[in-house]
Amino acid sequence: MTLRDVRYRVEYVLFRLAACLIEALSVRQTVSLARFGAWVMTHVAPRRVSRYHVASENIRAAFGADLSDAQVEQHIFRMWVHLIRLVVETIQLPRKLNLRNCRESIVFRDRAEVVQVLCSGRPVFFLGGHFGSWELSVATFGMFGFPMGVVARQLDNPYLNEWFRKSREQTGHRLYSKNGGFEGMDELVRAGGHLALLVDQDAGRRGVFVDFFGKPASTFKSIALMALEYKAILVVGYGVRLPDNPLEARWAQFEIGCEEIIDTTQIVARDEVKEITQRFSAALERSIRRAPEQYFWVHRRWKTDPATRQKLKDYEAKAA
């Protein structure tokens, strides 16, 4: 047994011990824990650790540079409250939510339109972002009898990765790694299956730049390219936590909804890939604007500058 394996095992044991405590938390206790944790991350933790400056830059990029420091700090505090609650709810999800009690916790907006698309016989790509409760959104469709392939990054710790894999697959889904899972996804979609993907990660210099909160954001082309190849229907959705009323409720309450349905066979544009990418990015932005505190502002969404992409093009042109 290597030192690394020992570390992974210790991490897993500590996680399972913490999970046992977390699973027993009530809504009121979760809110108190989240607010305390958010205060620590905002006011005590080193800003390099809390990625405070990244979140601050992103929030100002999205909502205007004229926001005061106090307003930005309030946004960041509320974001951390959400993220800590998200971690707790993700761990509690397998025990707290099932088909018998889901009506108590979930409101499904535009359900009829989504079910109609799912029954169309065509592949459906469910697109979302690091927003709201993305784990719950996907799990709900599995409970309703619509399993899909879920694309996610594999965790470094194999024991933790296996725990999360089982948690995600217990409602009938199939987990595919972002690296090396294409063959499985291809087989699933060609058989008429559905995929769930997060679409708000920076794609580097080779991505397609589209407007996201009024600023160019590098976005992966592969989503639009796959959708065009398979003639897939895109459903841009979300799952947001609703206000706690009352705090004594059995569990938190959520709204799952469809922001936009995009039929890729109906796209008429000079650059179909960019048009599709812009449309689903704009739809995601609209949903985030309604609950900005539930977005993951600490990730580098605008990491790649469009000027970097142009430099790459110039270099490739000279090399040719």
Task: Describe each model-derived feature in a short phrase.
Residues 118-179, 205-208, 212:
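Catalytic core of membrane glycerolipid acyltransferases/transacylases, capturing the structured
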Residues 17, 54, 112, 136, ...:
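Short Gly/charged-rich anion-binding patches and loops
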Residues 52-54, 153-158, 217-220:
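Active-site metal-coordination segments of metallo-dependent hydrolases
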Residues 100-106, 153, 170-176, 213-214, ...:
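Short, flexible loop segments at the rims of nucleotide/cofactor-binding pockets, characterized by
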Residues 2-7, 65, 69-77, 116-120, ...:
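Non-catalytic C-terminal accessory region of glycerolipid acyltransferases
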Residues 1-128, 162, 166, 172, ...:
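Membrane-anchoring hydrophobic helices of lipid-metabolizing enzymes
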Residues 58, 135, 168, 200, ...:
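Acidic active-site catalytic centers that drive phospho-/nucleotidyl reactions
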Residues 13, 51, 106, 177, ...:
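Soluble or luminal CAZymes and related metallo-dependent hydrolases
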